[in-house]
Amino acid sequence: MLTCVEAMPIKHPITRLSAEERREAIIRAALKVFSENGFHGTTTKALAKAAGVSEALIFRHFPGKEELYAAMQTECCRLKSNEESERVMSLDPSTSTLVIMVHFLIAKMLIPPKDASGIENSLHRLLAQSFMEDGEFARQFMRHVADELIAKLEACVKAAAKAGDMIDSPVRPDLRAWFVEHFAAMLMLNQLPGEPIVVFKASPAAQLEQAVWFALLGMGLKPEAIRRQYNPKAFALLTA
């Protein structure tokens, strides 16, 4: 027979978030809402509901929707950097690094939404929404891309040319980098709805290998240099 003490429900202590933790939680929740509705289609009421807080608490951390959106932009740039990408970015500019970076970039863009992280999916949708609105979020994000990814790809193109691994090309090194980034982004957009818009008649591994070859050839890398540096099966370990 249970005593009164035994029958009493156990009350678990409520974990309260610090001000900084609460601010970060609001930003993470806002990322999903903004990615689904865009800036103009998102209300503070919807943001508060997603974050599980009151609108008053939202305004305690952010004076307005614009400030929350700006904070989210900064957070997106931070979240995009991870240990894996940092290892790739730390490599010295070379033909080998160029091949690794292009494989890494395209492999990430070809991950189906169902297999990607929630944050990654929200970021991609947010970029797509931004292109349909004023483009401000996309511009800020692309400045981050230019400072890191594009600058490193450009340096690798120049290093590969110096090593004799590039064909003569009238296309500037920086534009070669940007065009490959745009190509990879379009591959991502094709997958974004969950069911690809265009279904390629190739396995995921074959799609990746073909896309990497296409990108590297377009950048001007000689076929013999690609064959020497690119081992798709070994490179798959980068994104396994």
PLM features: what roles do these ranges have?
Residues 14, 117-124, 138-148, 161-214, ...:
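Hydrophobic/aromatic-rich alpha-helical bundle segments in the mid-to-C-terminal region
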